Amino acid sequence: MGGIRRRTLIVLGAGPAQLGTYLEASELGLVSIGCDSDPRAFCIRLGVPTHHHDVSAMNPVAIAAVARRYDAVGIIAAGTDGPVRIAAEVAFELGLPHPLDPATAARATDKLAQRKAFDAAGVPQPAWSADGSRPCDGAVVVKPVAAQGQRGITRVEPRGSLDAALALARAASRDGAALVEELIEGPEVTVNAFVADGEFYSLMVADRECADAFGVATAHITPSAHPVEAAIEAARLATRALGIEHGPAYVQIVLGADGPRVMEVAARLGGGHDGELCAQATGVRLSRVAVLSAIGEQTPAPQATRASGGVVRFLLAPPGRLERIEGLEEARALPGVQLAHVYREPGDLLLRVARGADRAGFVLTTGATRDDALLAAERARETIRFVVR
């Protein structure tokens, strides 16, 4: 690893989803350059990037200029979908190593392309349509083809009109297109994996708890409380269908009455501190492996060394103007608490939770069992208080 020291990595984004990437880059001795147009982004305020450039993570021309300026050895997009394609395109343009080629990155960030690829490969997935029609008789989900987070997603009941939902989804999509998908009822799991030379390695399966707001995760809990073998196989088929040969993969799956259904694949680290959770619960430092793959370093096939309970519990604050945060240091000192951070500062306006960006912070806990980790997370959550007016 000595050859890595003092080399520069471009990281697209500086929000909570990139925290683990910056921490691992620092431990590897890399200079990290955070590209984010928000000077108050969470990781910037935390001081974890070596340097910050006020450029959008979706601006390939500006990112290429920053990479040239620092003679970067790699570019990584972690935790959010949009920059995945940008990172691959800029790396290709500059001749830098990268786990994804531009065509694969484009497929992995386009929900319509994913659906078509899954159909062609026989991957279990919901019924869907791209022409604005209903693909089934039951409830459906209308979503943008090219967006991230929970932007533009609406549930429509069997007798409901699709018109308003389609308009919302198309407005939120980078390409103005929308999908209508069968709503699959059942628990949701996420498969966190790494692909090395075409081989799929499932590292952690977590249960994904959601808030009332459609699709907003409130917790990731590992190990899963459900049988996961079929879900892991579906995740493997889905990543292969997209042509992912190397790099991290994050697969969202609903365990329906007729078996697992793949909701989507992200060719990146998960955005809910999944890399940090994987390291604590399994011993695999997934964020580190992803950083190494982004700079062209060969890494051995990752293997879990333990299987303890682990939880990422997101903190949901009441709406209002934040006056102060209480109990954070006390929570950090509680048994089982490995990480605890808040994303907000006094003076921030806190909104009702409608998308992932509205969450106020997180705690990461571990325990000998899943229940132990859940208990530690609940104690930590109750200790941290957001005082608003």
Q: Where are these predicted regions, by residue range?
A:
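Short beta-strand-to-loop capping motifs
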Residues: 156-158, 193, 315-318, 363-368
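ATP-binding N-terminal substructure of ATP-dependent carboxylate-amine bond-forming enzymes
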Residues: 1-104, 300, 317, 343-358, ...
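Active-site nucleotide/adenylate-binding loops and adjacent lid/helix of ATP-dependent enzymes
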Residues: 105-179, 185, 197-199, 220-237, ...
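Short, conserved charged micro-motifs
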Residues: 60-62, 135, 161-164, 320-325, ...
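ATP-dependent carboxylate/phosphate-activation module, predominantly the ATP-grasp catalytic core
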Residues: 160, 182-244, 248, 255, ...
